[in-house]
């Protein structure tokens, strides 16, 4: 995996916004050294309104980024479109590199 244990942090998923990929109460391993946005990867992000959130970052066709929940219910979990450069105004805490949960 090529990670330094000093850069790893364990957090717990809350809610159903990332189902079916990540379930409520799953254990997540976050690599705090990987804070640059990468298309299609899942990150822990600090939101002033919501605290720490776990979402997928998707590059937009409109020169920006989308903060996306994996849950298909877009009425409850709508995409958040960030114009180019605005993604850097959010504090990316690290990339989620592993998850563990109940079978």
Predicted regions and their residues:
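Acidic/glycine-rich C-terminal interaction modules and beta/coil loop segments
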Residues: 3-103
């Amino acid at each position: 995996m090529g990670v330094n244990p000093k850069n790893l942090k364990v957090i717990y998923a809350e809610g159903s916004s990332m189902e079916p990929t990540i379930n409520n109460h799953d254990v997540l391993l976050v690599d705090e050294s990987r804070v640059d946005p990468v298309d299609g990867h899942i990150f822990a992000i600090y939101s002033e309104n919501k605290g720490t959130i776990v979402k997928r970052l998707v590059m937009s066709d409109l020169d920006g980024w989308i903060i996306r929940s994996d849950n298909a219910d877009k009425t409850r979990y709508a995409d958040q479109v960030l114009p180019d450069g605005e993604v850097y105004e959010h504090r990316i805490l690290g990339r989620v590199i592993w998850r563990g949960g109940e079978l």
